[in-house]
């Protein structure tokens, strides 16, 4: 019972932080709508609709798969295998997110013309594609820290990510975009991308500081595919239904 209490309290902490971030994010969106107007908000929503689908496809179930594989190794007291787990998950994530990002970057003009119906979103979609692999790799590290029960650390990084996104977005809006809808949309995507870079850097640095033992290479690929591919398929189908 004593061991379960920290897990319970950390789960409460993560839930509370997520609720707080949602409240802050909603308030920030309301403030943005006043700054950039209805046209800017409409453009942002169009980009985020396509971006969310691309993100789901790029993540390809890797966050949950990383969490599952990490928890399995820790449960069997094999911390020496964590380096191989993370390296394989990183390779999978880079392959999937890189493929999706390339398709989004090259296909942005076609999507803007034939699907979205607004060519102003092309620069924002391409900028989103540039940052997409970073966002997906952050999902790998988030899954690892969740499985390792380092919820407090993850919550602190998520708060810092939200604050960084807001600061970068507001600074670029006031210094460059003004009331221009296309530039405002770019600022929002830039804020999210920069904050994802900060998050990935922080989580990788914290992981390196752990200095866990390294063991012999183990077969991870099949286990990863069995965990990630079904999740990826279900997530993509659900996201396609909600987007269309």
Feature names for model-found ranges:
Residues 1-24, 80-87, 218-234:
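N-terminal membrane topogenesis motif
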Residues 5, 37-40, 54-91, 146-153:
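Transmembrane-helix boundary and interhelical linker motifs in polytopic inner-membrane proteins
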Residues 32-53, 120, 185-186, 223-227:
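Interfacial/gating helices of multi-pass transporter permease domains
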Residues 45-74, 89, 93, 100, ...:
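Small-residue-rich midsections of specific transmembrane alpha-helices
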Residues 87-114:
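Alpha-helical transmembrane segments of multi-pass membrane transport and lipid-handling proteins
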Residues 102, 106, 117-141, 167:
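Alpha-helical transmembrane segments of multi-pass membrane proteins
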Residues 134-157:
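Membrane-interface junctions at transmembrane-helix termini in multi-pass inner-membrane proteins
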Residues 156-171, 179-209:
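Hydrophobic alpha-helical transmembrane segments
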């Amino acid at each position: 019972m004593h061991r379960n209490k920290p897990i319970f309290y950390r789960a409460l902490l993560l839930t509370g932080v997520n609720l707080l971030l949602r409240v802050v994010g909603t308030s920030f969106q309301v403030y943005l709508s006043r700054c950039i107007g209805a046209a800017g908000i409409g453009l942002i929503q169009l980009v985020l609709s396509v971006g969310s689908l691309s993100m789901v496809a790029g993540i390809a179930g890797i966050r949950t798969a990383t969490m599952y594989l990490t928890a399995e190794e820790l449960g069997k007291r094999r911390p020496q295998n964590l380096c191989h787990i993370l390296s394989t998950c990183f390779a999978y994530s880079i392959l999937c997110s890189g493929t999706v990002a390339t398709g989004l970057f090259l296909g942005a003009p076609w999507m803007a013309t034939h699907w979205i119906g607004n060519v102003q979103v092309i620069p924002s979609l391409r900028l989103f594609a540039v940052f997409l692999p970073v966002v997906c790799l952050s999902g790998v590290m988030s899954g690892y820290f969740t499985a390792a029960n380092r919820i407090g650390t993850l919550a602190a990084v998520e708060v810092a990510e939200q604050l960084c996104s807001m600061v970068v977005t507001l600074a670029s809006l006031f210094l460059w975009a003004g009331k221009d809808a296309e530039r405002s949309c770019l600022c929002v995507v830039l804020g999210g991308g920069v904050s994802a870079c900060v998050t990935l850097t922080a989580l990788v640095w914290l992981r390196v500081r752990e200095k866990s033992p390294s063991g012999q290479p183990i077969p991870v690929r099949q286990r990863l595919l069995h965990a990630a591919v079904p999740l990826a398929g279900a997530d993509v189908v659900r996201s396609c239904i909600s987007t269309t």
